[in-house]
Every structure is written in structure tokens, then in C-alpha cells.
């Protein structure tokens, strides 16, 4: 059943539609989130709003973004435009492969923003048609281009865009996995919003989950050196901060301290949380929570070979040079190719990553490392 507060919001929304002189610019944040809450749990209401919605699109897990670089943004389309364009390529969408992302203001009321994800069929092996070329043509017809989700997350400048993409990918993947009740194995009825699923037998309700991750920039007591790591299998020459998943029963500070010990084999003297976090949808949904830690620079580094290729202390000047290179080459087109050069600091993660923001603040002298001991 809808909550009382949600019913009030919906009544107000209907009134606004009836008397169009009232602008949604006067609708506050509370009204917006209560409307979203109503849409999340009321399938019939969301179904009636679907034809009025705006949508962003993924095809074969590739996101439709603007052609402009480096200011990458998701392309938003009206329901009718997207339906027509996809229909020309034999593609369809409906609520079953769409998820609710946000509520957008119009001059009259608020409309839903959906993400819709489509899997395109592969052409026959002997077909002269190239699927890659078809997707390129589709992207052009929709006013954009398709790109890898990870690259989109790393290069989008706007936090709202990155967070919406993280939500889009996370809900889409969760809805594709949660088909059976983990308790009784009966079928689950997925909400149209993809915000939850209810067991048809035991009525247990399941919600999308995410895993908390600590990401920590380690500095020395002088705050003039930072310890950065290169993950096994990552792009050559790219160094980042230490990160790892929290375990049951751990605080985030305890998680950060343990991950540092596991991955680089040193102890930290102090650690504090930064007012920074980032949803990250790959490979599974997580929330990265930023910390800064202080460790003595004379400790012997012992990397975990299963996780890392190398970990090194760098001066502020060295890290600043890598930051400058990254800003000049945000798509990492000039990555080093030789094995030795891959182990040298050339880049930090692109601007869309929380690690970039942490490292950049430290380079600019805005990240102090003093605080309480663990």
C-alpha cells in the first residue's frame, strides 16, 4: 500500500497538472523524493507515467552518450523518439527492461527518468552486416555514440551523471539476477521500477544491495609523499589508492586498515574518513568511501601478488606530473607499452574516479593527514 505521505504528494501532482499555471520549480526536494517513493512501489502508477518519461539507453551494456569529448554525458530521449528510432532497427523496449532512475521537472509537473537496457541479436555468421557498424549507425541516429560503461564512469565530469549511470547499471544487473527467492526458491515478482522484488509464495521482499568499499590514500607523516599502487591486470602506468571490500563486523576505518596491511604489508598510525564517496557499478554494485591514512615511510612494502603488481612511495612532484598527464589525456590513449614502463607512474585514474579526486586534493595541498589514531 502507498504511504500516506506519498498519496498527498500524488494528489498535489495531479492538481498541478490540472492547473498548469503552477510550476514545478516550486516543488521541493521532499516532494520529489516522496513522489519517487510512490513510483517505486506502485506499478500501476509507474506504468501510466512510462509513455511520458525521458529515457537513457544501453545496448549490449554500452551506454549512449553525447559525441562531445571530453565532456561526456548521457543522451536523454523522449519515449516517442526512442520508440521510433529503435523500431527502425527492429529493437523494442518496455518496462520489463527499464528501471526508474530519477524524477525530472517540467513546466507543469514531474516526469520519470528511466534507463532502458537492450540486448541486440547477433547477425548470422555469414551475414555481411557488422553489428559494430549497425550500433554506430544507431548511435548517430540517436544523436550520440555508444561507449563502454567503465570508460563512461571514468570520464563523465558531472557527479550526477556518474551516479545515475551507477544506479542504471546496478539496478539492471540486480533485476537480471534476482529471479528466485533465496529463502524458498519460488519466483520473484519484480517491481516495474526495479527497486525491489517480492516472493510470490512467502511474500518476502528483496531490495538491491551494494557492498561498502574503503579507498584510502596513504601519506607519510610529513604529508610530502603518497603511497600508490598498481593493480594486477590494470592499464599500464596507472597508479591509484588502496581499496577493498568491508567484511562483516568491520567499521570502515577497520576495513581500510586491514586492506592496507593485506595489500601492501604496512601498518598505519592514523586514519580518518573524508567527506567523499562514490557509487561504483562494476563488476557488482559497491559504494566507495574515501579515507586518508598516515604510515611511516621506512616500513618495508610487501605487496599481495594476487592483488597488486607494485606499490611505491612517490613525491608530491611525481604525482603532480602524473595528474597533469592524466588531465591532458583523459581517455588514456598514450599508455606505456613496454613492461618496464608499465611499472612507472605515468597516470592516475581519470577524473570520474573518486581516487582521482582524492589524489588531486592531496597534490593541491587540500588534503591534510592529521587526525585520530586507530
Swiss-Prot record:
InterPro entries the record matches: NudC-like_C (IPR049734), NUDIX_hydrolase-like_dom_sf (IPR015797), NUDIX_hydrolase_CS (IPR020084), NUDIX_hydrolase_dom (IPR000086)
Record: residues binding Mg(2+) 2: 259
Keywords: Hydrolase, Magnesium, Manganese, Metal-binding, NAD, Zinc
Binding site for Mg(2+) 1: 243, 263, 307
Short sequence motif named Microbody targeting signal, residue ranges: 367-369
UniProt signal peptide: none
Record bears the keyword Cytoplasm: no
Enzyme class: hydrolase
Cited function: mRNA decapping enzyme that specifically removes the nicotinamide adenine dinucleotide (NAD) cap from a subset of mRNAs by hydrolyzing the diphosphate linkage to produce nicotinamide mononucleotide (NMN) and 5' monophosphate mRNA. The NAD-cap is present at the 5'-end of some RNAs; in contrast to the canonical N7 methylguanosine (m7G) cap, the NAD cap promotes mRNA decay. Mediates the hydrolysis of some nucleoside diphosphate derivatives.
Protein name per its UniProtKB record: NAD-capped RNA hydrolase ndx-9
Native organism: Caenorhabditis elegans
Amino acid at each position: 500500500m502507498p504511504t500516506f505521505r506519498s498519496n498527498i504528494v500524488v494528489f498535489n501532482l495531479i492538481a498541478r497538472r490540472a492547473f498548469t499555471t503552477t510550476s514545478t520549480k516550486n516543488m521541493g526536494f521532499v516532494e520529489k523524493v516522496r513522489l519517487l517513493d510512490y513510483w517505486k512501489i506502485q506499478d500501476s502508477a509507474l506504468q501510466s507515467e512510462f509513455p511520458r518519461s525521458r529515457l537513457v539507453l544501453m545496448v549490449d551494456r554500452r551506454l549512449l552518450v553525447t559525441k562531445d569529448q571530453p565532456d561526456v554525458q548521457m543522451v536523454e530521449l523522449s519515449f516517442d523518439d526512442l520508440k521510433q528510432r529503435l523500431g527502425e532497427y527492429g529493437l523494442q523496449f518496455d518496462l520489463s527492461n527499464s528501471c526508474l532512475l530519477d524524477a525530472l521537472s517540467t513546466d507543469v509537473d514531474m516526469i520519470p527518468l528511466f534507463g532502458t537496457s537492450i540486448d541486440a541479436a547477433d547477425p548470422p555468421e555469414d551475414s555481411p552486416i557488422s553489428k559494430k557498424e549497425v550500433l554506430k549507425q544507431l548511435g548517430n541516429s540517436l544523436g550520440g555514440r555508444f561507449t563502454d560503461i567503465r570508460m563512461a564512469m571514468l570520464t563523465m565530469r558531472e557527479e550526477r551523471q556518474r551516479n545515475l549511470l551507477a544506479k542504471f547499471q546496478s539496478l539492471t544487473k540486480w533485476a537480471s539476477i534476482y529471479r528466485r527467492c533465496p529463502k524458498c526458491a519460488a519466483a520473484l515478482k519484480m517491481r516495474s521500477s526495479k527497486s525491489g522484488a517480492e516472493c510470490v509464495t512467502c511474500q518476502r521482499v528483496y531490495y538491491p544491495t551494494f557492498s561498502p568499499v574503503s579507498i584510502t590514500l596513504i601519506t607519510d607523516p610529513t604529508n610530502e609523499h603518497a603511497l600508490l599502487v598498481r593493480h594486477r591486470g590494470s592499464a599500464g602506468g596507472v597508479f591509484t589508492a588502496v581499496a577493498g571490500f568491508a567484511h562483516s563486523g568491520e567499521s570502515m576505518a577497520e576495513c581500510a586498515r586491514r586492506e592496507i596491511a593485506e595489500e601492501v604489508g604496512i601498518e598505519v598510525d592514523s586514519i580518518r574518513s573524508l567527506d567523499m564517496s562514490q557509487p561504483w557499478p562494476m563488476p557488482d554494485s559497491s559504494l566507495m568511501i574515501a579515507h586518508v591514512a598516515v604510515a611511516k615511510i621506512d616500513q618495508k612494502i610487501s605487496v599481495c601478488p594476487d592483488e597488486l603488481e607494485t606499490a611505491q612511495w612517490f613525491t608530491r612532484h611525481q604525482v603532480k606530473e602524473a595528474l597533469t598527464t592524466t588531465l591532458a589525456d583523459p581517455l588514456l590513449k598514450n599508455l606505456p607499452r613496454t613492461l618496464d614502463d608499465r611499472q612507472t607512474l605515468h597516470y592516475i585514474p581519470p577524473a570520474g574516479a573518486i581516487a582521482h579526486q582524492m589524489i588531486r586534493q592531496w597534490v593541491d595541498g587540500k588534503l591534510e593527514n592529521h587526525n585520530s589514531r586507530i
